[in-house]
Amino acid sequence: MYIVFYSTSDVFKAEEILNNNNIECKVVPTPVQDKAYCGVCVETHDEQAKTLMEDLEFEVLE
């Protein structure tokens, strides 16, 4: 799943949160061409990731 954000700083906050919780993830280019999102996102296969980032504004793309 791709977790997309409106700001690059949120992408790196999310990556840090996930890494600190031992959830495998990587920062990749956003797969959609939508100017509402920044150019990078977090890719992970762990459903728990969504609950760990409740304080950040994001959307999930499957």
Predicted region positions:
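Positively charged, small/polar-rich N-terminal and surface patches that mediate targeting and assembly
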Residues: M1-E62
